[in-house]
Every structure is written in structure tokens, then in C-alpha cells.
């Protein structure tokens, strides 16, 4: 804050001059104590001057309404929304989100440091504060092929950027626990004193070793017991509610008045249709309160706790000297803000956004570098008398299970089996590195005919296709190759629906309405082809390639047993 600004703030705080804006008569949430108090919020420029009784050049009556700090998302991947950052900003601001902490490892897996720099550029000078944690695992493991390999040396020039706060989720937890040199190099990056964690199911001495490396948070807990152990060992707990990982209600029983201040809320990977229809962090608060959890604790998690976890001491509370990032709600049941201020400026009024996002600063480059896609690549010779490892989908989770099944075969080759819901799954390397193709089997999609394809395939984002028919699988793969990446549904040899994602094969260059319309078409066709209502087909598909979440995955290099952290044969 400049001295001249501080002089004005202090004069208004003393009540000697009118504030620029005063929110009058609201029920104000105190993030420090969890209390509510009736009063005014006085704002000068970007700063809160005081709480109490004030007059202002502009006064906004919020009597009977609930006033809170702007909400924060402690961990998300912008790319997972499938819209560009500036388009996402519009959605988040409408939901009262004023600060986010993003890990751009999706685009970094495709474009390397150029992708991180693009995200930094695209989030400059917008009314949403976007901070970044540098991707720590590109690729996530050596058991897949990404578009680049990010070493500590490549990341170091980005450390000094003012919106880079540390190192993103350390997914290579075996490498961390066992002190792998490349992992330790990244943990030692100058300036990266904060490091987010990713340790699904890690406990006991392995958890001790993981956290002793300097990692200080985790968002992968799925049970209250796991959450409590991580809290006891000093990690910040980020309670996640994502499109494919619904963990919030399972974790909230671990939150108590004594440990609440070490807890934050996170959306991780949340799809656009759910952001638009349900919301973001505000929706997580709504879920929690609807199930009887104290709104005060949930608000602390979404504001002050998150700010303090990332050592940002200028936000997260309605108090003198803090940023004037503010939400006003009609009630504590429906958390859709009626008024949102960002840096002291009204940005949302009566659920209408008062900001127009500028266009993309850079035209997308083609990132689809596949070699020829051929039917022969999909062939799996049957191994008589041997069972195959099959990836089993767990509904509403990104975890998978491993099954051992005698697959259906025709003419000596494995084929999809709709009666037992066992489908063929393929991953094509798309970065132009080696032309690999991995082929496996998956159970739980419910698909009765056709094929689904996606270049959103965590974390290396190769091309993944699941299908009943090899020819439809090939048609879907070729369609996305020609489109520059995206999502596609194919049946009877025809593309039934497609969403092009020309930004690294991950994000659209179109507006929310366009993307939403295309997603609705895709969802319609997945249902038509048999996918049950409780399976988010494309979100589920996108995580079947992630070799750091138990238990069985498929990469371009083959089947990955995450427990063994090794490539395994299809046949037992």
C-alpha cells in the first residue's frame, strides 16, 4: 500500500472522512473467531479501513444479508474445466471465488514451461487472483510419455515470478519417500518453501518420510481416518469435492473445532457443466451446511485458512488492512452471492457479472502429433488359460480396482464384452515422441456400442479411447487428431458429438455457452450408448491413465500397477 493510500485509509478508519464504499448494516463474518456481528464494512481503494459504524461516498445497504470474505480454492487445475483462464474467471467470480491456487501441470505435460508461461500471461490483469504452484511431476512418472520432462533446472527461472508460490502436488510419493535425487532437486528449489502434497493412502512411517521432505498439505485423503492421520502429522488437509472424486462428506467427520484451522476446501478437477449448474467452493460450503456441519468452520476453510496456508496475510478476513475481497449472501442456505467485490470494486451485482473478459492473447498451436492410427494397434492376442488384468471403475471416485478375468475372444483376439461390461481401452502417445500404443481392458462404463475418445487424459494427456468396436475406436481417434484434440463420441462409424479443445488438447478457445452446449451433446450421446447416470463418462475416462492413483491404470507404455509402481503384463 502506498503512503498516500495509507493516509486515506487511516483517516477513514478513524471516521474523520467518508470511506469510498461502505457496506451498511450487514451480518459480518469474523474469520478469526468464527463469530457474526452486525455492522458496516468501510472500504478505501482496495483495502478494508474498518468494521463498525461508518459513512461512505457510496453506501450499499446489506441489512439482513451475510457478509463474508471472498472465497478461495486451495487446489485446482484450470485446464480441467476445459475453458481458458479468463473464461473460467467469469464463472468463479459469479460464485464468489476471488482467489485460486492452481497447479498448471496439465498444460505443462503438453507444452512444458511454455504452457506455464501461457497460463501466467492469460491470468494477468484480471479481477481474479490466480496464484500458481509449479508442476513438480512432469511427467507424473516414467511409466508414461509426456510432451516434455520438467527438471528442477527448467523450473528455476519461474520461481521468482510474484504469483508463483511454491511447488505443486508432489505426485511421485514413492520417489519422495525413497529420496530419489530428481525429486530432492525439485524440493530444494530456491524460493519454493511451500510444497503441496499428493499422497493417496500413504500412512505410518511412509507418511512421516513424505512430510519430512518438506511437503505440507494433501488433498488425496478419501476417509476420515486417513484425514486425521495427515492432520496429526502436520499437513494441511484440503477437503476435495471434484467431478470424479466426491470426498467432502467422507472427510468432514474428521474436522473438529480444534483442528478446523488446518483445513481448506478444494475442487481439484471440476468440470464446466458442474461449475455452471452447481458452483465451485460455494457449492462445497452448501453441501457441508446441508449435512449439518457448522457454516463458520466451512467459511474459515474457504477463506482465512487457505490464505494462511499459502502465507498470504493480506486476505481471507474482513478486518482493517485486509484486501476488500467480499461476498454478500442473502442467506446461509443458498451460497450464491448477490454482491461480490474484488479489490474494493463491485464485480458482481444481483448475480450479474460487471466484467467482460478480453480474448485470448495467443492463438493455439497444434499439439496432436500422432503417428498413423491403425487397427492393428488395437489387437490383443488371446492367451489361452490365462486371466487378464482388468481396470475396474469405482463409481464416483478416481480410484480404480484390479480384477482378473478370462476375456471374451474371437478368432484368437480379445474383443469387448458388453454382457460383462468389459471394454477395450487404448492410449496413443500424441506428443510425437515414440508412437507408443497401450491397450488394455476396463470394466464399469456400461457402454453398449460405439466409442469415446479424449485428449484430456491425466497427466500426460495422450489420446485415450474406450469402445465396443475397434473401427469406432479408430474413427474417434482420427476425429480428434484432425480437430487438434478434444472429446468425441462415435457410433456406427459416425461422429455423433465432439468438443474441439485446440488449446493443448485441453481447453477450448470458445466461450462457456459454446462449451456447455457441446458437453450437453456429448452427455446425451454417452447416455444413448448405455453409460449409466452415475458415471461421468469423460471425467472417468480422463483418469484411467493417471499412474499415481491406485490401483490399475493404462498408459501409452502399458498397464501400470500403482501399488508396485511398475508396468505389468496384461496377462496374470
Predicted regions and their residues:
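Histidine/acidic residue-rich metal-binding segments in metalloenzymes
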Residues: 115, 149-168, 172-239, 245-265, ...
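Active-site microenvironment of metallo-dependent hydrolases
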Residues: 1-44, 52, 93-95, 276-292, ...
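Divalent metal-coordination and catalytic microenvironments
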Residues: 26, 46, 64, 75, ...
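Divalent-metal coordination cores built from histidine and acidic residues
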Residues: 3-12, 89-194, 495-499
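Short, ordered loop/turn segments at secondary-structure junctions
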Residues: 104-107, 135-137, 172, 200-201, ...
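Active-site mouth loops of central-metabolism enzymes
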Residues: 73-84, 139-150, 216
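Active-site neighborhood of phospho(di)ester-bond hydrolases with catalytic His/Asp-centered motifs
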Residues: 68-74, 102-105, 133, 168-170, ...
Amino acid at each position: 500500500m502506498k503512503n498516500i493510500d495509507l493516509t486515506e485509509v487511516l483517516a477513514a478508519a478513524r471516521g474523520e472522512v467518508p470511506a469510498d464504499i461502505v457496506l451498511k448494516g450487514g451480518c459480518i463474518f469474523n474469520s478469526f473467531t468464527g463469530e457474526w456481528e452486525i455492522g458496516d464494512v468501510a472500504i478505501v481503494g482496495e483495502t478494508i479501513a474498518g468494521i463498525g459504524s461508518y459513512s461512505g461516498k457510496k453506501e450499499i445497504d446489506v441489512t439482513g444479508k451475510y457478509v463474508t470474505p471472498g472465497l478461495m480454492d486451495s487446489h485446482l487445475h484450470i485446464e480441467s474445466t476445459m475453458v481458458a483462464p479468463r473464461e473460467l474467471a467469469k464463472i468463479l467470480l459469479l460464485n464468489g471465488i476471488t482467489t485460486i491456487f492452481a497447479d498448471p501441470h496439465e498444460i505443462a505435460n503438453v507444452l512444458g514451461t511454455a504452457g506455464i508461461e501461457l497460463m501466467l500471461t492469460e491470468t494477468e490483469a484480471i479481477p481474479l487472483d490466480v496464484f500458481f504452484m509449479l508442476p513438480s511431476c512432469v511427467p507424473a512418472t516414467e511409466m508414461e510419455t509426456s510432451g516434455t520432462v520438467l527438471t528442477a533446472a527448467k523450473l528455476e527461472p519461474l520461481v521468482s515470478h510474484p504469483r508463483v508460490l511454491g511447488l505443486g502436488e508432489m505426485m511421485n510419493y514413492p520417489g519422495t519417500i525413497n529420496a530419489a535425487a530428481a525429486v530432492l532437486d525439485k524440493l530444494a528449489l530456491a524460493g519454493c518453501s511451500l510444497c503441496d502434497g499428493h499422497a493417496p493412502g500413504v500412512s505410518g512411517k511412509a507418511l512421516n518420510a513424505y512430510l519430512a521432505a518438506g511437503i505440507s498439505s494433501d488433498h488425496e485423503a478419501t476417509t476420515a481416518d486417513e484425514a486425521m492421520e495427515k492432520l496429526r502429522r502436520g499437513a494441511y488437509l484440503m477437503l476435495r469435492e471434484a467431478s470424479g472424486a466426491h470426498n467432502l462428506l467422507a472427510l468432514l467427520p474428521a474436522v473438529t473445532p480444534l483442528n478446523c484451522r488446518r483445513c481448506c476446501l478444494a475442487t481439484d478437477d471440476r468440470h464446466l457443466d458442474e461449475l455452471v449448474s452447481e458452483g465451485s467452493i460455494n457449492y462445497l460450503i452448501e453441501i457441508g451446511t446441508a449435512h449439518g456441519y457448522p457454516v463458520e468452520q466451512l467459511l474459515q476453510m474457504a477463506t482465512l485458512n487457505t490464505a494462511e496456508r499459502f502465507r498470504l496475510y493480506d486476505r481471507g478476513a474482513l478486518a482493517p488492512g485486509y484486501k476488500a475481497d467480499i461476498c454478500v449472501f442473502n442467506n446461509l442456505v443458498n451460497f450464491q452471492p448477490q454482491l461480490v467485490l474484488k479489490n474494493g470494486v463491485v464485480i458482481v451485482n444481483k448475480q450479474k457479472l460487471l466484467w467482460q473478459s478480453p480474448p485470448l492473447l495467443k492463438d493455439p498451436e497444434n499439439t496432436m502429433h500422432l503417428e498413423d492410427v491403425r487397427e492393428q494397434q488395437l489387437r490383443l492376442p488371446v492367451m489361452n488359460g490365462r486371466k487378464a488384468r482388468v481396470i475396474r471403475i469405482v463409481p464416483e471416485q478416481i480410484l480404480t480396482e484390479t480384477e482378473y478375468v478370462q476375456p471374451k475372444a474371437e478368432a484368437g483376439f480379445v474383443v469387448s464384452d458388453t454382457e460383462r461390461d468389459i471394454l477395450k481401452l487404448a492410449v496413443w502417445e500424441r506428443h510425437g515422441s515414440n508412437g507408443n500404443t497401450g491397450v488394455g481392458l476396463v470394466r464399469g462404463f456400461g457402454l453398449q456400442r460405439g466409442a469415446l475418445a479424449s485428449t484430456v487424459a491425466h497427466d500426460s494427456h495422450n489420446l485415450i479411447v474406450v469402445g465396443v468396436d475397434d473401427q469406432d475406436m479408430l474413427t474417434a481417434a482420427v476425429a480428434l487428431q484432425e480437430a487438434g484434440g478434444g472429446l468425441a463420441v462415435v457410433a456406427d462409424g459416425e461422429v455423433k458429438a465432439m468438443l474441439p479443445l485446440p488449446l493443448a488438447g485441453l481447453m477450448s478457445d470458445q466461450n462457456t455457452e459454446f462449451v456447455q452446449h457441446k458437453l450437453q451433446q456429448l452427455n446425451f450421446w454417452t447416455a444413448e450408448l448405455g453409460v449409466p447416470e452415475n458415471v461421468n463418462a469423460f471425467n472417468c475416462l480422463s483418469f484411467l491413465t493417471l499412474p499415481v492413483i491406485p490401483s490399475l491404470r493404462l498408459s501409452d507404455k502399458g498397464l501400470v500397477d500403482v501399488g508396485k509402481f511398475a508396468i505389468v503384463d496384461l496377462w496374470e
